[in-house]
Amino acid sequence: MSAFIVSQPALERNARILREVADAAGCRVVLALKGFSTWPCFEDLRPLLDGCCASGLWEALLARRRFGKHVLTYSPAYAPEEIAELAEISDHLD
């Protein structure tokens, strides 16, 4: 069994910096679930980030159900049986 410790103050401080950069640049900042998918932290990140970037069906489902904002999904290939569901839950599908 593994355990991870996340510094909430550091996470929020970094997310606020990203929010400031996004506002100044006029762009969106999304959470890459491949790099950080610790969904119990999503509640603190949700107000500061614009959504999530997923790399497949399971990450897109996590983003839609737990983060609840813009879901961008990208993969070099998709399983044919997953495309309909991905199109339904993703705001952008590449």
Placement of each model-derived feature along the sequence:
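Active-site-proximal beta-alpha core segment in soluble small-molecule metabolic enzymes
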Residues: 27-94
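A non-catalytic, amphipathic alpha-helix used as a structural packing/dimerization or gating element
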Residues: 9-17
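Generic N-terminal amphipathic, Lys/Arg-enriched alpha-helix
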Residues: 1-6
